[in-house]
């Protein structure tokens, strides 16, 4: 084989190998922070699922604390631990869902107040997409809220938010 043919053959083999690597299915890792192993083995759900650079955190009940605000703060601290298990941070969170125990709209709005406060402590800028839902009950009795999240590892390193501030509200005549 001529040197030119050998070089072309090598390039084709390398290109084929690179293509095979880029089209391979991402890895899927089931993870659980210390203390959450029972979720996987007894209740049969994965606390943290890592697929490639995507991290999915199952619902974390706000179960520990003296009041709703403390319980919610505990849940966000647990979220940090869950993300860390997969190599992600709070800055990498791209979506947040929260499920709030409430019997009607008025109670939902009231119970959302401590969530808004604590959410602001953990997300100071470049906020994730967020959906808050009222529900009559959660699996963990006494938990006022449960949070789940999705993150993309590394996405929080250089976020960009080009959203202008709204104009101040105008007084009503």
What are the language-model segments listed below?
Residues 1-7:
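Bacterial N-terminal signal peptides that target proteins for export
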Residues 14, 19-94, 100-173:
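N-terminal presequence-like segments and the immediate start of the first folded domain
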Residues 7-8, 18:
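Cleavable N-terminal signal peptides
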């Amino acid at each position: 084989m001529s040197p030119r043919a050998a070089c072309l053959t090598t390039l084709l083999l390398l290109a084929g190998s690179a293509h095979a690597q880029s089209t391979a299915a991402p890895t899927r890792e089931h993870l659980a922070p210390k203390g959450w192993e029972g979720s996987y083995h007894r209740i049969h759900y994965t606390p943290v699922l890592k697929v490639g650079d995507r991290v999915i955190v199952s619902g974390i009940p706000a179960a520990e604390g003296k009041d709703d605000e403390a319980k919610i703060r505990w849940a966000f601290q647990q979220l940090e631990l869950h993300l860390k298990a997969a190599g992600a941070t709070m800055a990498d969170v791209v979506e947040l869902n929260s499920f709030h125990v409430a019997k009607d709209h008025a109670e939902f709005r009231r119970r959302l107040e401590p969530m808004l406060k604590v959410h602001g402590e953990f997300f100071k800028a470049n906020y994730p997409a967020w959906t808050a839902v009222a529900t009559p009950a959660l699996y963990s009795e006494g938990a006022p809220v449960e949070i789940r999240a999705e993150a993309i590892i590394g996405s929080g390193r250089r976020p960009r938010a080009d959203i202008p501030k709204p104009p101040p509200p105008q007084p009503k005549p």
